[in-house]
């Protein structure tokens, strides 16, 4: 529930240093379905908004990119119905997804999965961030 972001903020605020050590070995278990991935990223977005409300110094453009991408993509699709040139931002986003998938994938299967995974991560995170209610607070409070 965004504990890592909040801990990093509190460490830095108190003069601590947060860094990555490449010698660390971690085990990551990816979600088994796109739906489970969407749920995970929706929750990430919701809780990131909670941290940004409590600690305004933790928010930056990188964290605002998914909500802006979601809103921009959606508006582009709606506006494009009335003026086709306005489909352009959505088309550019999709082009970036295709190019990123080509660059990252090591097989056709991975490429096809990435075409679904990348927008799922962006849009679910953005939707969670946008829809996060002000009443959402960590359980300990």
Question: Where do the protein language model's features map onto the residues?
Answer:
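Catalytic donor/gating beta->alpha subdomain of glycosyltransferases that bind UDP-sugars
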Residues: 1-59
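Hydrophobic transmembrane-helix microenvironments that flank and shape a buried ionizable site
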Residues: 1-3, 63, 119
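Select subsegments of transmembrane alpha-helices in polytopic membrane proteins
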Residues: 59-67
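Short, flexible loop/turn segments with low-complexity composition
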Residues: 62, 140-141
């Amino acid at each position: 529930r965004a504990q890592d972001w909040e801990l990093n903020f509190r460490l830095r605020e108190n003069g601590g240093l947060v860094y990555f050590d490449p010698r660390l070995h971690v085990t990551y278990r990816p979600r088994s379905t796109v739906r489970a991935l969407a749920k995970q990223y929706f929750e990430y977005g919701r809780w990131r908004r909670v941290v940004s409300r409590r600690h305004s110094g933790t928010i930056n453009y990188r964290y605002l990119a998914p909500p802006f991408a979601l809103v921009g993509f959606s508006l582009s699709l709606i506006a494009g119905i009335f003026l086709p040139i306005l489909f352009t931002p959505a088309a550019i986003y999709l082009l970036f997804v295709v190019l990123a998938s080509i660059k990252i994938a090591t097989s056709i299967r991975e490429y096809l999965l990435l075409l679904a995974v990348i927008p799922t991560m962006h849009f679910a995170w953005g939707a969670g961030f946008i829809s996060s209610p002000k009443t959402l607070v960590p359980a300990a409070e």
